[in-house]
Amino acid sequence: MRDPVSSQYSSFLFWRMPIPELDLSELEGLGLSDTPTYESKDSSSVGKMNGQASGTEQKNPEGDPLLEYSTFNFWRAPIASIHSVDLDLL
């Protein structure tokens, strides 16, 4: 069985750099300060921010300017366009 103390230091999560805290004042210059903040995967949510969207709003964020970058459709390859002339040849 692996020793939990020594395996702790050999893991990727121990040695990676922590993700820096997001400064909301920097978002004001980008025009994104009024967007809802999203809940972290941690269910404890000790550091919830004011103005955070509720669970139903997070599941259906209509009008979110960053939504197109967080969906599967943005990252997949575009669908090839087929013209009617090409379909007639098939």
Swiss-Prot record:
Q: Which family does it belong to?
A: Belongs to the MLLT11 family.
Predominant subcellular localization, coarse grouping? nucleus
PTM sites of type Phosphoserine:
84
Pfam families in the cross-refs: WRNPLPNID
* Superkingdom, taxonomy of origin: Eukaryota
Region (Disordered): which ranges? 31-64
**Organism name:** Mus musculus (Mouse)
GO annotations under biological process? extrinsic apoptotic signaling pathway; intrinsic apoptotic signaling pathway; positive regulation of apoptotic process; positive regulation of DNA-templated transcription; positive regulation of mitochondrial depolarization; positive regulation of release of cytochrome c from mitochondria
- Function description: Cofactor for the transcription factor TCF7. Involved in regulation of lymphoid development by driving multipotent hematopoietic progenitor cells towards a T-cell fate.
What upregulates it?
A: Up-regulated during neuronal differentiation (in vitro).
**Stated name of the protein:** Protein AF1q
Q: Where is the composition biased (Polar residues)?
A: 35-58
Known partners and oligomeric status: Interacts with HSPA8 and LAMP2 isoform A; the interaction may target MLLT11 for degradation via chaperone-mediated autophagy. Interacts with TCF7.
Q: In which tissues is it expressed?
A: Detected in embryonic brain cortex.
Q: What positions carry the motif Nuclear export signal? A: 24-32
Key words, A-Z: Cytoplasm, Cytoskeleton, Nucleus, Phosphoprotein, Ubl conjugation
Q: Which GO terms describe its cellular component?
A: centrosome; cytoplasm; cytosol; nucleoplasm
Query: Is Ubl conjugation one of the keywords?
Result: yes
Q: Which PANTHER family match?
A: PROTEIN AF1Q
What does the UniProt record tell us about how this protein is modified after translation? Answer: Ubiquitinated, leading to degradation.
Write out the annotated subcellular location.
Nucleus; Cytoplasm; Cytoplasm, Cytoskeleton, Microtubule organizing center, Centrosome
Under the heading InterPro entries, the entry gives: MLLT11_fam (IPR026778), WRNPLPNID (IPR033461)
